[in-house]
A protein has these predicted regions:
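Nucleic-acid endo/exonuclease domains
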Residues: 1-115
């Protein structure tokens, strides 16, 4: 399974932080512009909370099937809300900006949101 540079950087950072995580990929028919499976990629436990981490693209027209992408994103958002699981969205982020401090701050922010 291919990973984007972004997800690879996040998993490397989680390893540095010694945070347990599992990489989960669903809906393999929906691919990113670079050909790796899209949708939520990362499930981790942060300070006692399960968090889903997902990357999204501003330009969904570059995806092979934009309608399918929108449909799947809606399913995923519903899942996160109905299961009360925080969803950390990372939009087209430059992976070089991701540091352990940046990631832990983002995770802290997402788990304090009111579900």
């Amino acid at each position: 399974m291919k990973q984007s540079k972004l997800i690879k950087k996040i998993t490397t950072t989680l390893d540095k932080l010694k945070i347990p995580y599992s990489l989960n990929v669903f809906y393999r028919d929906c691919l990113s512009p670079l050909g790796y499976p899209l949708l939520w990629k990362l499930k981790l436990t942060w300070r006692g909370s399960v968090v889903l981490v997902e990357e999204r693209y501003h330009d969904t027209s570059r995806a092979p099937n934009p309608q399918r992408l929108q449909q799947v994103n809606a399913i995923k958002d519903d899942y996160a809300l109905s299961h009360k699981i925080p969803l950390l969205l990372i939009w087209d982020t430059d992976s070089s900006l991701i540091s352990p401090e940046w990631l832990s701050r983002q995770l802290d922010l997402v788990i304090t949101q009111d579900f």
